[in-house]
Amino acid sequence: MTTIEVIEVGLDTLEIINEPLEEQRYGFLLSPAFGKEGVNLRIRFELLLPINKKQYLFCKTITGFFLENFNQDYFKSEIETISGLVQTSMANARLLIMQKQQKLNYVQMKYFDNKYFQDEIKLQIKELGL
């Protein structure tokens, strides 16, 4: 059985941008560091949420996980697990927004099923040369 630990949750950027944004946007970047015991996986998550017709909220977070006994081959085969961690990173971004900008708790955010992220994860794994 694999143990997954959350080892880092941090807010990098939280700004209100005075430009219109039609709909929610997001992006993430996987940064795995493989070791003898497993992999440290940092996920940078960027979230852009419309506040009103003239402004949006820009949030960048970092969530770190330690995935015990993961090597490169196992990491590549566990797309569903990684998708769940990206989904967790997205939820962490929302929680950090709620903590730091309580007056903006009304801002709606769409959550996605973890399968939604799988194509991008596969692409990033390929780009990492794994």
What is each stretch, according to the model?
Residues 1-88, 102-130:
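N-terminal intrinsically disordered, cationic/polar leader segments
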